[in-house]
Regions:
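Dual-mode signal for accessory low-complexity, basic/Gly-rich regions
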Residues: 1-149
């Protein structure tokens, strides 16, 4: 089956999981055309749809907070069934809408499914990693637990 366009998440709701033929048959679902091998599943061209404001406007809307630039430990610190996560992060301190200082090795924790309900703004600039099939604009979230020095 060919890969086709689908909205995995829309308006904070999970619409579909991704299935290859094996798992679709096992779970009584239709394949979504996302096989990466006989047993693997991988999205192609997966991205978060852009919003309507610039990255600068998003930082101004944040005011004071943290701008995350990387997360580590996705395989060990995230529970795919419950959505709970506790991950090491790096980023920048944001004061009055301006990135002021780098911040390293802090922890962010929460629940992925709850975060979908805590999106307050999405920037208009989608970025893909080098050689990556995954992309996203900057996203402003409320209510994430953060700890560290």
């Amino acid at each position: 089956m060919a890969v086709y366009s689908k909205k995995v998440i829309e308006n904070g709701r999970l619409n579909t999981l991704l299935y290859n033929r094996m798992y679709a048959k096992l779970l009584g679902r239709q394949t979504t055309g996302n096989a990466s091998s006989a047993t693997g599943i991988e999205p192609k061209g997966l991205y978060i749809a852009p919003g309507t404001i610039s990255n600068e406007e998003l930082l101004k809307a944040l005011g004071d907070g943290l701008y995350l630039t990387s997360l580590q430990g996705l395989h060990a610190g995230a529970n795919v069934q419950s959505g709970d996560f506790s991950l090491q992060a790096d980023g920048f301190l944001v004061e009055k809408g301006v990135k002021t200082a780098p911040v390293k090795n802090f922890t962010v924790a929460g629940n992925f499914f709850q975060l979908l309900k805590q999106v307050t703004a999405v920037s208009s600039e989608v970025k893909f990693g080098v050689g990556s099939d995954y992309g996203a604009p900057d996203v402003l979230l409320s209510g994430m637990a953060i700890s560290g020095k």
